[in-house]
């Protein structure tokens, strides 16, 4: 006895149907969805029978608009990998049915917007962002329509505004009533190279050049305009700083300390070969302190020091042959070494035997005899081998002149 594959009962009818290599009652061969009798053609999935429409509706390609199956006889439209019914392929904003070949914009992979609605929406958003970014400007003027000759007057102002905006980021959350800044623009390395090359060619580009840069870099023209303003302001600040640094370098590095003294001295007063010569040709700014002569605070440099003869009074204060310090400035009442002053003979006199009728001053040479240099033998037979003006013996009583020690 043959049993039906659908109802599992024996088949007693005169006719039967053979479907999927199994016997069926004629009334049992029907669609499992719509229950219609299948006489000519049927579709099966997982042992179930379907009519053509229900099979493609359940297992065929789904419409991206209504999420329903698409029948093979239906007309469809394709956008990328999506398939739509003709009635489902519409603009999400104006619900206009999109035709073949029409430009459209895809949002969230399954939402489509016609070109007119997209451009209108983008222009509105751009105007809002520009209005929020350009605070305090006239809204009737477009930023790209301004004359490039006005850029210089706005360079420092835009730089200050950028600094103020950067410093006020922390207070944005607190000032809820104030307008918030527009979106920050990040310039990539390739875009930055293009802008730097354009700035090197023309620091003040015209609107036509800015439009070309906007097409090349993909940046907004307002962003490019502000970048050029800030870059010009930065270049001016760098030039000012470099000029100030050059002036400071020239002021501090020039040897000016000895110029007024050289101009005031006569040519005959300089004795480059004497033991107490004036170092007018020395170009250094500083002198090293003397080793043992405290009343000469500054000593001559070793390169141009004149070494006098070994004097007896120098044995107690330092090694023989130590040069005396150079006098840096001429003082009133002090004569240059050309007038035959003998410092050893002056120091040999005690304070009470000074030929000068003036009272002894604390800074005079008369009071510095034995306290500074210690005991010394008489200076009767020693002479200074320095120059022609120092050939006289130190035993001669010199003409004393009052002078303060420098």
Curated annotation (Swiss-Prot):
DNA-binding region(s) in UniProt: 180-239
Pfam families membership: Homeodomain, LIM
Keywords from the UniProt entry: DNA-binding, Homeobox, LIM domain, Metal-binding, Nucleus, Repeat, Zinc
Cellular component GO terms held in the UniProt record: nucleoplasm; nucleus; protein-containing complex
One example of a Gene Ontology biological process annotation: head development
Residues annotated as signal peptide: none
Positions of region (Disordered): 125-187, 296-372
Composition bias, Low complexity: 137-148
Localization per record: Nucleus
Biased composition (Basic and acidic residues): 151-167
Superkingdom of source: Eukaryota
PANTHER family for the chain: LIM/HOMEOBOX PROTEIN LHX (PTHR24208), LIM_HOMEOBOX PROTEIN LHX1 (PTHR24208:SF106)
Notes concerning its domains: The LIM domains exert a negative regulatory function and disruption of the LIM domains produces an activated form. In addition, two activation domains and a negative regulatory domain exist C-terminally to the homeobox.
Full protein name: LIM/homeobox protein Lhx1
Species assigned in the record: Gallus gallus
